[in-house]
């Protein structure tokens, strides 16, 4: 009887450790920093095309993650994608004239937003909660690039043929 209780205790402990490890790995994979919220401020930007950008996509400066996409909506007036970005509070010295562009990690990787710092000449305001970044560059969609390449090559083939027939 005593041996059975000891055996059940160790099996239960092992099971709890396994469940804890799975929860830990799940949070790491989901890129969740824990249950405590990091202090951040939110800025918005409007793009012509966001491609496959998703909520929780990283905001990076030089490859370093400084924030995440918190929401993606459609602007009611212009019908363009409006992206809300939560920037970690420790990065509060970003000039308002900075620019955003949507990039892709690798050829077919996840999309992220790259922030290029603007200049700070003393009179330039810094981003704060509710600011809007005006200078944006939309995502380059792979299908569009392939279409342009194919269309461009057909056009040049057609021009070459017409030039050779004129001679």
UniProtKB/Swiss-Prot annotation:
It holds the Pfam family MlaD. GO terms for biological process: intermembrane phospholipid transfer. One of its GO terms (molecular function) is phospholipid transfer activity. GO terms for cellular component: plasma membrane. Residues 40-118 are annotated as: MCE/MlaD. It is found in: Cell inner membrane. Keywords: Cell inner membrane, Cell membrane, Membrane, Signal-anchor, Transmembrane, Transmembrane helix, Transport. It is a single-pass type II membrane protein. InterPro entries: ABC_MlaD (IPR030970), Mce/MlaD (IPR003399), MlaD_Phospholipid_Transporter (IPR052336). Residues 28-167 are periplasmic. Disulfide bonds: none annotated. Residues 1-6 are cytoplasmic. The chain crosses the membrane at residues 7-27. Its main location: membrane. Belongs to the MlaD family. PANTHER family: INTERMEMBRANE PHOSPHOLIPID TRANSPORT SYSTEM BINDING PROTEIN MLAD (PTHR33371:SF4), INTERMEMBRANE PHOSPHOLIPID TRANSPORT SYSTEM BINDING PROTEIN MLAD-RELATED (PTHR33371). Part of the ABC transporter complex MlaFEDB, which is involved in a phospholipid transport pathway that maintains lipid asymmetry in the outer membrane by retrograde trafficking of phospholipids from the outer membrane to the inner membrane. MlaD functions in substrate binding with strong affinity for phospholipids and modulates ATP hydrolytic activity of the complex. The complex is composed of two ATP-binding proteins (MlaF), two transmembrane proteins (MlaE), two cytoplasmic solute-binding proteins (MlaB) and six periplasmic solute-binding proteins (MlaD). NCBIfam families: OM_asym_MlaD. This is Intermembrane phospholipid transport system binding protein MlaD. It comes from Haemophilus influenzae (strain ATCC 51907 / DSM 11121 / KW20 / Rd). The gene is mlaD.
């Amino acid at each position: 009887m005593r041996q059975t209780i000891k055996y059940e205790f160790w099996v239960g402990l092992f099971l709890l450790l396994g469940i804890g490890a799975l929860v830990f790995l799940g949070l790491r994979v989901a890129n969740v920093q824990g249950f405590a919220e990091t202090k951040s401020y939110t800025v918005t930007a409007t793009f012509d095309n966001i491609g496959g950008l998703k909520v929780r996509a990283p905001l990076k400066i030089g490859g370093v993650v400084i924030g995440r996409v918190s929401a993606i909506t459609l602007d009611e007036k212009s019908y363009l994608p409006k992206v809300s970005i939560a920037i970690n509070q420790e990065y509060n010295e970003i000039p308002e004239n900075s620019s955003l562009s949507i990039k892709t990690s690798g050829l077919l990787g996840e999309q992220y937003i790259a922030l290029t710092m603007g200049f700070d000449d003393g009179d330039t305001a810094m981003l704060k909660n509710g600011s809007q970044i005006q200078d944006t560059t939309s995502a380059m969609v792979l299908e569009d690039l392939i279409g342009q390449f194919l269309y461009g090559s057909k056009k040049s083939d057609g021009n070459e043929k017409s030039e050779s027939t004129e001679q």
